[in-house]
């Protein structure tokens, strides 16, 4: 799909603006920095998970000690004004152990520990008043219990038990015998959504959109059919081959495969896009055989019925195939870099920009995904098992991206990243329609 260029946004202060870091590949090995010591070997073989603080450090996030965390940044580097966040990036100091907010990722991380957005009776919160949190949750005001409808752990340091619990939460497993029990109903246990580190958030045309660091990718079944076998269950997307099998799950829990699966001795940290997707006029049903009803932008007279359906990751996910490394694209379909390079970004770039997917493409995607005959395969989304329809929102990088050969992160270029405040939905909707029209024009060329 055609990308929206920086030139299309220049001069428009109300345009869609977001932070999106490209994926960064780093070797997990012994390091002199205090945030990642002892988590690998000198031959770059993966040994075990980084704990959360160490993983954040690898991504450039400096986490202060909990004892001195004041709840809000006190350095004045990042400020929150009029619903938006504006931060000045600084060069990353990978060996720094002080508590300065040293780069744009750290600044966004710390400024996000407060209410982020309000949408259709749902309050999206990241962190708490006292300690920084890696995860987020959503509280629906319409529930009498006041309990968060989406939930994930908020711990900064995990032991083995927490790692296992995280895997079960992310992938829909809840089992101690290593048997395949992927149909566990985790909603009853409060474990219904994957974890993301939010790097930016906005409300766009009555839709909640955020850029985030991927910690897992899971779809949530929103079918209203009480007889559906998948009702209220988490739908797992695997980032490791054979994760639906006993061996794949056991290997991941025992930390032998790596968080996303090792490729050529490298550990992949995917710090890139993620989306909350809108659904308008969604039809339920256990087999979801009716026509796809998702549309974007949502019309003004139907915005009240728009629903946040599920999460989608628009980043290459590591898996294994007969012809090399395979990935999921934004529709959850299985592509191969060697066989379909024109559809995918390069391995060295991995900065993904997706256009708006129309209904016919979604329908085709569902039909394609249904063509898989292997029930244990997790290389394609099984659309017959979910009433969720995935629709990527065009949410893209706003800074001037350097030429090939000089691809560095924004904070390494002393760039400025600004997250714009939400504006009136009808105004933003017109802007998105213009983007959509430009995308269609470019695609037809």
From Swiss-Prot:
Region: Disordered; residue ranges are: 23-44
Top-level taxon of origin:
Bacteria
InterPro entries per the UniProt record, alphabetical: MgpC
The protein's matches in Pfam families, at most eight in alphabetical order, are given as:
MgpC (PF05220)
**Extent of Low complexity compositional bias:** 31-43
Could you say which protein family the record assigns here? Answer: Belongs to the MgpC family.
In Swiss-Prot or TrEMBL terms, this protein is called Putative MgpC-like protein MPN_464
Tell me which species this is from: Mycoplasma pneumoniae (strain ATCC 29342 / M129 / Subtype 1)
């Amino acid at each position: 799909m055609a990308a929206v260029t920086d030139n299309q946004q220049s001069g428009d202060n109300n345009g869609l603006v977001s932070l999106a870091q490209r994926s960064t590949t780093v070797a997990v090995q012994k390091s002199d920095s205090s945030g990642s010591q002892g988590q690998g070997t000198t031959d770059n073989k993966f040994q075990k998970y980084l704990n959360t603080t160490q993983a954040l450090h690898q991504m450039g996030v400096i986490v202060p000690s909990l004892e001195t965390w004041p709840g809000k940044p006190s350095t004045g580097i990042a400020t929150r004004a009029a619903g938006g966040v504006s931060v000045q990036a600084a060069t990353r100091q990978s060996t720094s152990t002080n508590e300065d907010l040293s780069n744009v990722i750290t600044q966004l991380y710390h400024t996000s520990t407060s209410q982020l957005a309000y949408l259709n009776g749902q309050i999206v919160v990241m962190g708490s008043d006292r300690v920084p949190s890696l995860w987020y949750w959503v509280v629906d005001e319409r529930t009498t219990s006041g309990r968060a409808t989406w939930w994930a752990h908020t711990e900064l340091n995990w032991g083995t038990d927490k790692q296992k619990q995280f895997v079960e939460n992310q992938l829909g497993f809840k089992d101690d015998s290593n048997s395949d029990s992927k149909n566990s109903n985790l909603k009853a246990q409060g474990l219904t959504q994957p974890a993301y580190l939010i790097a930016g958030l906005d409300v766009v045309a009555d839709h909640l959109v955020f850029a985030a660091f991927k910690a897992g990718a899971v779809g949530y079944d929103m079918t209203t059919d009480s007889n559906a076998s998948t009702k209220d269950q988490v739908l797992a997307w695997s980032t490791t081959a054979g994760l639906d099998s006993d061996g794949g799950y056991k290997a991941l829990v025992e930390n032998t495969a790596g968080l996303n699966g090792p490729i050529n001795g490298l550990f992949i940290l995917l710090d890139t896009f993620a989306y909350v997707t809108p659904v308008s006029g969604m039809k339920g049903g256990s087999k979801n055989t009716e026509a796809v009803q998702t549309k974007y932008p949502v019309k003004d007279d139907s915005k009240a019925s728009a629903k946040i359906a599920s999460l989608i990751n628009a980043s290459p996910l590591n898996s294994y195939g007969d012809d090399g490394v395979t990935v999921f694209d934004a529709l959850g379909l299985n592509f191969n870099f060697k066989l379909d390079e024109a559809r995918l970004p390069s391995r060295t770039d991995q900065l993904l920009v997706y256009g708006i997917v129309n209904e016919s493409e979604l329908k085709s995607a569902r039909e394609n995904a249904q063509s898989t005959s292997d029930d244990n395969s997790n290389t394609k989304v099984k659309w017959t098992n979910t009433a969720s329809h995935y629709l990527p929102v065009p949410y893209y990088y706003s800074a001037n991206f350097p030429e090939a050969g000089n691809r560095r992160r924004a904070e390494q270029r002393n760039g400025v990243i600004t997250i714009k405040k939400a504006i009136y939905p009808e105004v933003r909707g017109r802007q998105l329609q213009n983007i959509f029209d430009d995308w269609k024009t470019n695609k037809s060329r």
